[in-house]
């Protein structure tokens, strides 16, 4: 997993309280990791803060899995 992937994984584990082994690229935040809509909003905000970028609402709606988040952040992260 890339450095960005590892940072995403850490945020997901901290915010959702899931086992690190469950945080894989194909894992759906809602279906596999038990997030609700508020959790997903909080994750997006945590990603924005950690990576110094804005995630517009239309982009946030397409970030459904851990892999989606990593791909978006690899393209858009400032740090």
Swiss-Prot record:
Q: Cite the entry's keywords alphabetically.
A: Cytoplasm, Fatty acid biosynthesis, Fatty acid metabolism, Lipid biosynthesis, Lipid metabolism, Phosphopantetheine, Phosphoprotein
Q: Name one GO molecular function term.
A: acyl binding
Protein location = Cytoplasm
Described by its record, this protein's role is as follows: Carrier of the growing fatty acid chain in fatty acid biosynthesis.
Q: Cross-referenced PANTHER family, in alphabetical order? A: ACYL CARRIER PROTEIN, CARRIER DOMAIN-CONTAINING PROTEIN
Pathway stated in the Swiss-Prot or TrEMBL entry = Lipid metabolism; fatty acid biosynthesis
Q: Which family does it belong to?
A: Belongs to the acyl carrier protein (ACP) family.
Mark the residues carrying the PTM O-(pantetheine 4'-phosphoryl)serine: 37
SMART domains with a match to the protein in the record: PKS_PP (SM00823)
Q: Where is the Carrier domain?
A: 2-77
Q: Which SUPFAM superfamilies match?
A: ACP-like (SSF47336)
Name of protein: Acyl carrier protein
Which PROSITE patterns does the record cross-reference, listed alphabetically?
A: CARRIER, PHOSPHOPANTETHEINE
Q: Name one Pfam family in it.
A: PP-binding
GO biological process, any: lipid A biosynthetic process
Q: Which GO terms describe its cellular component?
A: cytosol; membrane
The UniProt PTM text for this protein says: 4'-phosphopantetheine is transferred from CoA to a specific serine of apo-ACP by AcpS. This modification is essential for activity because fatty acids are bound in thioester linkage to the sulfhydryl of the prosthetic group.
